[in-house]
Amino acid sequence: KFVLADRAPGFGDPAKPKPVLYSLSYLTPTESDNPNISFNQLMISFDVELGEGNPGAIGVDHQGAQGTATEDVHVEATGAFAGFRGTSGSGGGVSHISVRGGRYGLYLDATDPFASYAGSQPSPVISAVELTGQTEKSIHAATRGPLTLVGAAIDGPGIHLAGRPSDWDGALNVIDS
């Protein structure tokens, strides 16, 4: 279990959200975070608690491509920004995750300092997701390609599709939910 201390420095500004756990890849020693070359990175079987007084906190930021997966990860985000930011696609996946609380359960959009990236790799599939008690939107999505939810249980303010500039981006498939 990963626990963020109450009122932790650097996690107090929701205009500049910041993840507790963040995976990335490097192009060069000075050029980091290119999700389309983040391969075979796994985040499996753990819990994250975002503490009190951390309105800018995100539990997990894990966006990658082939072989990248997030499985059996659960975030307590009451009073925080979001449980998850970014998601895998292109041969990766997300399964058996949950978020309780937060402004957003899943915030699938770009944030600074990497605002040019979409909120996902192409065509993300998220299965067996449970989102409860969010205050703004359960899911905010600006994905590359369609977002597919399978077996989603959402008890909160719904899904917002933010759209992207290309016609093939931003669609939503909801299956057995």
Language model features by range: what are they?
Residues 1-177:
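Extracellular/periplasmic carbohydrate-active domains that bind, remodel
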